[in-house]
Amino acid sequence: MSAYLFLLMLVLIGVISNNQSVIIASSVLLIIKAIGFGDQLFPTLASKGISWGVTIITIAVLVPIATGDIGFKELWNSIKGPVGIVAFASGMFVAIAAGQGVQLMRVDPVVTTALLAGTILAVGFMKGIPVGPLVGAGIAALILGGYQVIEKWF
């Protein structure tokens, strides 16, 4: 019963914060659970959902290449200036951090729970978008790695 209440609360948070992603995700999960398909679908969604989501985001990002709006010339011109260099480096950093984050989420369930809570709060009330768990886990992994290095010194 608490799962239903939690999901309903997330739908309400989504409505209050006008966050369509939270409304849709929470509603879909609530419906799947209510019609009795949770046991069949939740394990697959849990194990493959992030990968599917990353694939969909990647498709959306690559659409300008597919339409011809961005080609090699535009790509090269975009990374020549300071803003482009910072954006390029940031993209690399976030991708590397997210990769580390996926690994951390696999080995430490406590991290996943804390990240989920932070993501729900940020998405629900601060206009965030729910890519936070991957990036958040990546940043956490980098910080924890730095902490472990410092801890060895002292």
UniProtKB/Swiss-Prot annotation:
Q: Which residue spans adopt a coiled-coil conformation according to this UniProt entry? A: none
Q: Say if the entry is tagged with keyword Isomerase.
A: no
GO (cellular component) term, any one? plasma membrane
Membrane topology field: Multi-pass membrane protein
UniProt keyword list: Cell membrane, Membrane, Transmembrane, Transmembrane helix
Keyword hit for Glycoprotein? no
Where is the chain membrane-spanning?
5-25, 52-72, 82-102, 107-127, 129-149
Q: Where in the cell is it found?
A: Cell membrane
Q: Where is the signal peptide?
A: none
* Cysteine disulfide partners in this protein: none
- What highest taxon heads this organism's lineage? Bacteria
Q: What is its main location?
A: membrane
**Family per UniProt?**
Belongs to the UPF0756 family.
Indicate what this protein is called per its UniProt record. UPF0756 membrane protein EAT1b_0668
Q: Which organism is it from?
A: Exiguobacterium sp. (strain ATCC BAA-1283 / AT1b)
